[in-house]
Amino acid sequence: MSDGGKTKTTVEIYGQSYTIIGQETKMHMRHVASIVDDKMREINEKNPYLDINKLAVLTAVNVVHDYLKLKEQYEKLEIQLKEKE
């Protein structure tokens, strides 16, 4: 870790190196990068003619969609738990 409790690590996403600085562990940041890389490759398999910018945007849209679906499920579970109390 560097000053201020921040961690710096280099990751590879879709063949490009990125330096990421954050408060999470290197392992966590690498895991996040791996998920992004996997998602980009998954989308590229289905749409091999997309340029890198469109691929990145579609990846972001897909990841946010997945996040929102999980958030909705979490909120429903919270409501169900409160109803049982």
Swiss-Prot record:
Pfam families: ZapA
Family in the record: Belongs to the ZapA family. Type 2 subfamily.
Main location: cytoplasm
Residue stretches in coiled coil: 60-85
InterPro entries: Bac_CellDiv_Activator, Cell_div_ZapA-like, Cell_div_ZapA-like_sf, Cell_div_ZapA_firmicutes
Function noted in UniProt: Activator of cell division through the inhibition of FtsZ GTPase activity, therefore promoting FtsZ assembly into bundles of protofilaments necessary for the formation of the division Z ring. It is recruited early at mid-cell but it is not essential for cell division.
Subcellular location, record wording: Cytoplasm
GO cellular component: cell division site; cell septum; cytosol; plasma membrane
Name this protein carries in UniProt: Cell division protein ZapA
Sorted UniProt keywords: Cell cycle, Cell division, Coiled coil, Cytoplasm, Septation
A biological-process GO annotation: septin ring assembly
Lipid biosynthesis found in the keyword field: no
Subunit structure: Homodimer. Interacts with FtsZ.
